[in-house]
Amino acid sequence: AIDDNKSCVGVYSGGELIFNKLPENLTKTWKYAAYLDNMDVEYAYIYANGQQLAEVCPEHLLGDWKRVKKKFEAYLKTFQIAKVSLYDNCLYDLVPHGFLKEFFNVRNNITKHVFENYDKPDNYDFLSETYKTVYDIKHQQLNIDYNSIQKASLSHAMKGYLHNLKKYEKRCSYNIFGTKTGRFTNTPDSFPILTMPKALRGVIKPQND
């Protein structure tokens, strides 16, 4: 999958970027996206027990991966500075297709390495369904009302924390492999709902109240 945005259907397969219509022979990829839900696809990310691509990358691909990842992160930084949300835009509309082919070619080779060298977890089906659930949660926008907090009553530290909260997308992204005990953690780019101080939790409002 090129993009995990639900409305941005696209895959890299056979050396080409394919949009809107998915190839019928797609059976393996790195991570889940909603438009793959009705297909019999396995995810290398789950085989790798949540490890990042750099952690599972074979030595002979590591240089290529570092190079394309650095350039990819530069694009993401540009979008962040320009306040362009990838929840509202498709990655393939923002990044040159030539680079996307290069990036996903390397990623596909790492993915292939994982499937060839890692055992399928005994609880793969459970992990897959759990991963799809947290994916759905990530794509639901939180109802945040920063004005509901009486700022005058907050300590200096809490005012600083509240200010920093506004840097995050109003979405919760969970890592299902975050702890050895099986508890979820928030990913670094997630709204930090699991670690929010009690004094600030009132900014989160119900969706259907």
Which residue stretches match the model-derived regions?
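Acidic, glycine-rich two-metal-ion catalytic cores of nucleic acid-processing enzymes
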Residues: 14-63, 67-209
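N-terminal low-complexity regulatory segments of large eukaryotic nuclear proteins
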Residues: 1-2, 6-8, 17
